[in-house]
Swiss-Prot record:
Part of the 50S ribosomal subunit. The keyword Ribonucleoprotein applies. GO terms for cellular component: large ribosomal subunit. Disulfide bonds: none annotated. The lineage of its organism: Archaea, Methanobacteriati, Methanobacteriota, Stenosarchaea group, Methanomicrobia. It comes from Methanosarcina mazei (strain ATCC BAA-159 / DSM 3647 / Goe1 / Go1 / JCM 11833 / OCM 88) (Methanosarcina frisia). Keywords: Repressor, Ribonucleoprotein, Ribosomal protein, RNA-binding, rRNA-binding, Translation regulation, tRNA-binding. GO terms for biological process: regulation of translation; translation. Binds directly to 23S rRNA. Probably involved in E site tRNA release. Protein L1 is also a translational repressor protein, it controls the translation of its operon by binding to its mRNA. GO terms for molecular function: rRNA binding; structural constituent of ribosome; tRNA binding. InterPro entries: Ribosomal_uL1, Ribosomal_uL1-like, Ribosomal_uL1/biogenesis, Ribosomal_uL1_3-a/b-sand, Ribosomal_uL1_arc, Ribosomal_uL1_CS. Belongs to the universal ribosomal protein uL1 family. This is Large ribosomal subunit protein uL1. Coiled coil: none annotated.
Length: 213
């Protein structure tokens, strides 16, 4: 059951923000308190599966070859990078940066991981886009599908951070349930739960914001 205050805030933001000629992202601005963010244990680094997804298709890059690469492409991967192409990226950091900015996330067969870490870590690491390892017993199609509905909560060393919860053209109830899912995870992982939340606002990309916490 969606909390009325969250649903009301979502509806108000959508209704009162000027309409754009593109589908705006709906985000949460999360402000923490009473935490020493110099201590890694206090930093938020969580993946959350949203019940209603983000309302858009994520661009996923997959480092794979052979049958896994073919199945990744069939499952909707935007890019499938072979071992030969990985070598090319390692030799051309500008090309690697373009790919890193183009993709929302990456998945890699485990045998690719050491090479990626050594040659592309400097590009992917700071962007929070180091690949998710594809374990031998995991189906690439299922993994791609699950990641389409996933978001990362990453505070790094800051008390304030943002996370997307969907698109403006989504149903307000669906957006609200996505927000509740994120809030529930946050309260579980923070040292003092909701008492470590100074405030949380819902906002559109270029619109107004409304407080939900």
């Amino acid at each position: 059951m969606v909390e009325r205050t969250i649903l009301e805030a979502v509806k108000k933001v959508i209704e009162e923000s000027p309409k754009r000629n593109f589908s705006e992202s709906v985000d949460l601005a999360i402000n923490l308190k009473n935490l020493d963010m110099n201590q890694p244990k206090n930093r938020v680094d969580e993946e959350v599966i949203l019940p209603h997804g983000l309302g858009k298709e994520l661009k996923i890059g997959v480092f794979a070859k052979g049958d896994v690469g073919l199945r990744a492409k069939a499952a909707g991967a935007a890019y499938v990078i072979s071992d030969v192409e990985l070598e090319e990226l390692a030799a051309d950091k500008n090309k690697a940066r373009v790919l890193a900015n183009e993709c929302d996330l990456f998945i890699a067969e485990t045998q690719f991981m050491p090479i990626i870490g050594k040659n592309l870590g400097i590009v992917l690491g700071p962007r929070g886009k180091m690949p998710i390892p594809l374990m031998p017993n995991k189906d690439i199609g299922e993994l791609i599908q699950s990641k389409q509905n996933a978001v990362k909560l990453r505070s790094k060393d800051r008390l304030t951070f943002h996370v997307a919860v969907g698109r403006r053209n989504m149903n307000p109830d669906d957006l609200s349930e996505n927000i509740e899912t994120i809030m529930s995870r946050l309260e579980r992982v923070l040292d003092k739960g909701k008492h470590n939340l100074r405030s949380v606002y819902v906002t559109t990309t270029m619109g107004k914001s409304e407080r939900v916490v």
